[in-house]
Design a protein with these regions (language model features):
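Charged, E/D/K/R/S-rich low-complexity terminal regions of large eukaryotic assembly subunits
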Residues: 1-36, 50-62, 66-221
């Protein structure tokens, strides 16, 4: 179906309201099959802007949740900016925006607590939680050298020891001592770049005042 949708998004047909039903169905397929197509989803939101009467809260919620699965990319912000302010204050959209804010500001424990109270939001969304955990692992990987075992488990959504070990194995993290997980040596990860700029400047070819004019003004020869 992705190929067919790609054809619909070309040229003036991109914002043809007659294609909206097909595009909305495509959003549902993405949710169920753990697929993702930002271009198609943005087209749906743009069609809602052009045709406010066609707005579907459920489809918009699915688009926002799918955008969260692609953090740290800016997809969520792009989608949010295309939703009318009045619609952003409606449920469940306002709840999803709050979840997005918690993730973007790295309040991971608060995110899982808020999500636990709104698990119905994930109905029909396959792989959402694991996609969020990938983002959390990305943040941990660029932030920590060592992290407490209990803290990582909390940040990942209160995972069991076996579940946490699976993620640790995936990212090459090891428990070097009881209760402490080694992430990486951040100093070794930093790769400084030396930038050398060579400027050819033939001072002898210029008149004396043009070489150091400020000095010559203070100390005339």
């Amino acid at each position: 179906m992705r190929a067919n949708v790609g054809k619909l998004l070309k040229g003036i047909d991109r914002y043809n309201p007659e294609n909206l039903t097909t595009l909305e169905h495509y959003v549902e397929i993405q949710a169920k099959e753990n697929a993702y197509d930002l271009e198609a989803n943005l087209a749906v939101l743009k069609l809602y802007q052009f045709n406010p009467a066609c707005f579907q809260t459920t489809v918009t919620a699915q688009i926002l949740l799918k955008a969260l699965t692609n953090l740290p990319h800016t997809d969520f912000t792009l989608c949010k900016c295309m939703i009318d302010q009045a619609r952003q204050e409606e449920e469940p959209i306002c709840q999803i925006l709050y979840l997005g804010e918690l993730l973007e500001t790295c309040h991971f424990q608060a995110f899982w607590q808020a999500l636990d109270k709104n698990m119905d939001l994930l109905d029909g969304i396959t792989g959402f939680e694991d996609s969020v955990r990938k983002f959390i692992c990305h943040v941990v990987g660029i932030t920590y050298q060592h992290i407490d075992h209990w803290l990582l488990a909390k940040m990942m959504g209160d995972l069991s020891d076996n579940q946490l070990k699976t993620w640790m194995s995936k990212y090459g993290w090891t428990e070097t001592e009881p209760g402490t997980i080694f992430i990486c040596n951040q100093e070794e990860s930093v790769k400084p770049k030396n930038i050398v700029e060579k400027i050819d400047f033939d001072s002898e070819s210029l008149p004396a005042p043009a070489v150091f004019p400020d000095i010559l003004l203070e100390y005339p020869v």
